């Protein structure tokens, strides 16, 4: 078995804009002691529309392993980590990352993939939201 680890880094103002339509909102309170009980559900609902990983043609379920905030003010980023146990050897990996392309026409998402000691970087956007790697 191999563990697929997916890390997303999202500016908190963009997350708030996408989820509650107000970049300055403190309604969801990610990673705070009084985090909204609906914060994770709202985040996953949004991400499931704009982000997925398929390993060997099978979509991996997104389950949040952990979250953390980094930075200050408008530069605060929400880091979200997902893990998935991959039982069969990885032959292909299809990635869709159209996160925030609904909000920003020129949004570009940078993807780093590390498999078996080899690293690949991808840039995905509204025009090219998916890419498939074959191993």
Regions found by a protein language model. Name each.
Residues 1-135:
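N-terminal soluble domains immediately following signal/targeting peptides that reside
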